[in-house]
Structure formats: structure tokens, C-alpha cells
Amino acid sequence: GQRQRIVIARALILEPKFIFCDEPVSALDVSIQAQILNLMQDLQEQYGLTYIFITHDLSVVKHISDEIMVMYLGCTVERCSAKTLFQQPLHPYTKGLLSAIPRPVIHESKNDDDFLTGELSSPINPKPGCRFAPRCRFASEECFHKQPILKEFVPGHLVACHRIGSDIA
């Protein structure tokens, strides 16, 4: 936690407007994570900072973010407010990520259809089409040949998926 505080202090010396944070709390226990995240939020309010937060930990994302962009193998698949993402995800990859979050409620049923399966595509030599297609249970022929573009399906909610609005939403 002390190292993170020092790095934050060093970054603030330059009086930035944007701070890029790459896994800033990943190696910390939960109580120290909370302290660092609270410090970052306090500093954000005090100095009007904008954070670009890169992390794989969705609980951290939910705590710190106003807007979230989900990426898969270097491509944006979904972008919306944090509230919308956690309440109404649209992309199958986002749904899979959210279904993998451990829940404290023992008897709550998870939707097995959202679990991520299949082989990862090569990020170095990607095949044409949607990079998530080999792992997507909704993939159509189009998904394997044509890269989807990021489109606004509802105001403020952008998704890159050929199948949104068909049988997966």
C-alpha cells in the first residue's frame, strides 16, 4: 500500500488532469485495496482528476468507475456507464465476465449459459471476424468473417456484436 501511495504522490507533483492506472491495487489485500481506492476517489474530487483504469478485477471497476469499456483481445466489445454494465450487460463476453464474479449469496443461481468456454484466439495473429466468435455460443457465420463495429444500441450504451438485438439480448 505504501508503494502505491508514493506512486500516486509522485504522479500528482506534475499536476496532471489524466492519470493512467494499470492494475494499481492488484497485489494488495482487500482492506488495503479499499484504502487506496478511497484515497484515489478523494484525490479525484479534490483535484478534478480523470483516471484511465486498467484492471481485470471487476469489483474494483465497479467501485471506482463512472464509465466502463470492456475489451477482448485488444478490441472494445462494450462501453457504457458502470451502473448499466453491471445491471444490463449486452455483449456475451461481458455477461461471461460478470457471471464469473464470486457472489456471497450461496443459494443464488447463476446462469450457466453465460459462463465463458472455448479456446482463446491468438492476439498476435487474429483471424478475421469477431475475436470473441470462437468462444461465443451465439456466433453466426457472419461473426467468423466480419469484424463487428461499436454501435450505440441504446443511448450511452455501445456494443460491438452482430447478434445484439437478435436472439441473445
Listing of model-derived features with the role each one plays in the protein:
Residues 2-5, 34, 121, 127:
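Conserved ABC ATPase nucleotide-binding domain "signature" region
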